[in-house]
């Protein structure tokens, strides 16, 4: 099979809607929090039907896998991720990979997730969309809203009594947020302390950039 045709076939495979288990098995448990369990590890360690081993992906296939990891991890559409890459590719200075990571991590839905206020990015995306947060005294309902150093994120007064925010003290007692964000339980507000630093070993952002440069 010619390289171009094989690349197209690989791409189509990833466009098929799959249950989360299959997505995690293909892309790795880091994509969804629910896949980071002993049960998933045991199930995913089983060989393919017939004892077959998965074929080693092509270079294009590896790049595609990394792209899909980011898409599913942050809950982005193809267009959204493509636009992020275009924006950082035209920025001079620091490495493009670092800039892309900063943009992704600075999304409000991700920041709320990093503060420990939701069990997943999908959950915090809904929380933001439903208007539960105030950023610098303004209600924000756009999950992709980009926060900056010094921004203050508060739980809206009318939302504090809602079930999703019950027992926050208990939920956060063993949680350690990244060093670039903080959350004050007494005042029910968080703050952006610094730029996000890429400490992820699960994501290969350079491979994603290579995918879009093809």
Report the location of each language-model feature:
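Short, well-ordered loop/turn sites that connect or cap secondary structure elements
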Residues: 127-128, 147
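Beta-rich strand-turn-strand
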Residues: 118-121
